[in-house]
Amino acid sequence: MEPLGDRRPCCVCITKNRNCPRFCEYAEYFPYELRSHYESTNELFGTPKIIKMMRHAPEEKKQMLATSIIMEGNAWTNDPVSGGFGMVQKIMWKIMLHKAYLHELEEKIKEEKEKIELHL
């Protein structure tokens, strides 16, 4: 973790209305620059629950957890009805469309190859 120095307080300390300590355990995962994303995350989970999740996570998984927490908050902001599940559904739908398009292209390539072979 970096010393406070010139950095701004982390999002967790801002929402808890406390001074961000020099070696804040949350500054690395929720820096000031992510405050707009953290706001939606805070609305969804609440800072106490975020702190609890981060404290129970193994050190090597904390960055992944913080990223997941913020992504989930953003997903619910963008799609208040379906949240992350809606995001996954949209991605799966796009994959299906791209697979169908790829299949069409493969068929056209196959047809063109057959035409070329007939002319040789």
UniProtKB/Swiss-Prot annotation:
Where, if anywhere, are coiled coils annotated? none
| One Pfam family, short name | LOB
Q: Which InterPro entries match?
A: LOB
Q: Which residues form the LOB domain?
A: 8-109
Q: Which family does it belong to?
A: Belongs to the LOB domain-containing protein family.
What the entry lists under PANTHER family is as follows:
LOB DOMAIN-CONTAINING PROTEIN 4-RELATED, LOB DOMAIN-CONTAINING PROTEIN 5-RELATED
This chain's protein is named LOB domain-containing protein 8
**Organism, scientific name:** Arabidopsis thaliana
